[in-house]
Amino acid sequence: MAYPSNKVRGAKLISWQNDLVREFLSLKKDERLVIKKCRQVGCSFTFAQILFYVAINRPRSTSIYITTTNSAARKFFTDMGEFCKESSLVSLNSSLLEMTFWNGSIIYFKSSESQLRGISCKRGGIMVVDECAFLKSDIWTSILPFTTVSKANTLIASTPWTKRGMYYTFYERALSGDPGYHLIDTRDYDLSYFSSEDQREEYRKI
């Protein structure tokens, strides 16, 4: 499929973000990438770039972003929308929190407070579960089927606060090297670039 004439700019990724993207691109069907993240290290920005990548490069794909609350889902939708608000490539539905692309791809932005029925990842789409450690355990019976039929990849991220729950289960499996599970731990990297407000502000402008 040919791209429209609009200029599409890529993102500048730093430190651990490059490894996260490389690891994601190497995933096979039905594999999961677990991210153990620190605060203020550009994780949301990286998720946005991955979701954009999937939507643009996998026509008619359906991806799903899930987080803790409706307000958090709306904030992430709004932040992603800022990247493309003047582009004719993307249509934003701020009522339904949906982002539709010129090539038929769509991204749904949901939370544990949302109606989580009638959607699924399709045609190469992915599921991103953010702040997983803070989601109620019973939500997994609703969201895991989103990836079952298409064997979609799932990115599971959190700043953990307890050694129990579904996030810790995923983390332990990835740490143990279980087949189909991969791990990125931001503590393994030099995060000094993100350590000051001035540097974070500079990064947000990239």
Specify the residue positions occupied by each region the protein language model found.
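Phosphate/NTP-binding elements of NTP-utilizing enzymes
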Residues: 1-206
